[in-house]
Amino acid sequence: MAGELSIATELPTSPLAMEYVNDFDLMKFDVKKEPLGGRPDRAIRPCNRLQPTGSVSSTPISTPCSSVPSSPSFSPTEQKTHMDELYWMTNSYQQVNPEALNLTPEDAVEALIGPHQMPPQMQGYDSFRGHHHHHHNNHHHQNHHQYQGLPHEEMGLPHQHPHHHHHHHHHQPSPSPSGSSSSSQQLQNSHQQHQNSSAVEDRFSDDQLVSMSVRELNRHLRGFTKDDVIRLKQKRRTLKNRGYAQSCRFKRVQQKHHLENEKTQLIQQVEQLKLEVSRLARERDAYKIKCEKLANTTFREAGSTSDNPSSPEFFM
């Protein structure tokens, strides 16, 4: 706490300096250089009361006091050069909002030193100032045009970046006409290729592709593109494979029907042979019975003739 109080005593306490930073435009008003002598009548005030009541400043209140360098113009004991004043003004410029004040540290240095006291080493820096001031004014004009409908409290630096990103989020670039034209050209080319391939396929029928030899097909395909030739030969190969599969299937079905018919015929022949065998067996049995009857009749006749003799030798 003691260190912070000691740092706060070294800060500029003049209300004119704070109003010079916050309210006035250095391009319109001449700034009177204060003498280097001490100012005992100026009361030292704390760092948190440096901002006037009626002034509007974009500097955050939470800025630490140690980040603000002391003013060389208010030092009662030490003589500062113009380069030290330049360093103090550039550091003070970093603590305020440059967008709200619309000034650069080079403007403050030029107003403080004057055109007749410009050292030689500042001439190169002054040439760089013109380009930087032009770029700074263009950037401020763009931000003012973008946020001209917002209140003054919402134009601070912390609030500009979210609106800026939100603006870019909602206004994304639309596809270029060259991309749409290239896509339409690709669709047209693909449609034309499809028509050409259809014309090539319609030129030959399926029967012609199957019956045509490879040499004859190559002779007819001269002048066509490689993709069309490959597609047509693939179609011919597919048709031939399909025909071969259908032929094999037909042959298998035909052979199956032939075998079934032959089987039926063989079954019928077996039945006929069975009937013939049964008929022959019946005839055999009949002939056997007839043969037995004839044998019995012959034996009886032979026995009767031997029992009744009729010859004259029988009586002798």
Curated annotation (Swiss-Prot):
Q: Name one GO biological process term.
A: regulation of DNA-templated transcription
Q: Which residues form the bZIP domain?
A: 231-294
Alphabetical list of InterPro entries matching this protein: bZIP (IPR004827), bZIP_Maf (IPR004826), bZIP_sf (IPR046347), Maf_TF_N (IPR013592), TF_DNA-bd_sf (IPR008917), Transcription_factor_Maf_fam (IPR024874)
Superkingdom, taxonomy of origin: Eukaryota
Intracellular or extracellular location(s) = Nucleus
Give any Gene Ontology cellular component.
Answer: nucleus
- Biased composition (Low complexity) is annotated at 55-77, 177-198
**Where does the record place the region Basic motif?**
231-256
Pfam families recorded for this chain? bZIP_Maf (PF03131), Maf_N (PF08383)
- Where does this protein have compositionally biased stretches of type Basic residues? 130-144, 160-172
Q: Where is this region: Leucine-zipper?
A: 259-280
Renumbered residue ranges of the record's region Disordered: 40-78, 116-204
**A GO term, aspect molecular function:** DNA binding
Keywords recorded for this protein, A-Z: Activator, DNA-binding, Nucleus, Repressor, Transcription, Transcription regulation
The protein's job, in short, is:
Acts as a transcriptional activator or repressor. Implicated in the regulation of cell-type specific gene expression and play a role in inductive events during lens development.
How does this protein assemble?
A: Homodimer or heterodimer with other bHLH-Zip transcription factors. Binds DNA as a homodimer or a heterodimer.
**What family does the database annotate?**
Belongs to the bZIP family. Maf subfamily.
This protein is called what? Transcription factor MafB
Tell me the organism.
Answer: Xenopus tropicalis (Western clawed frog)
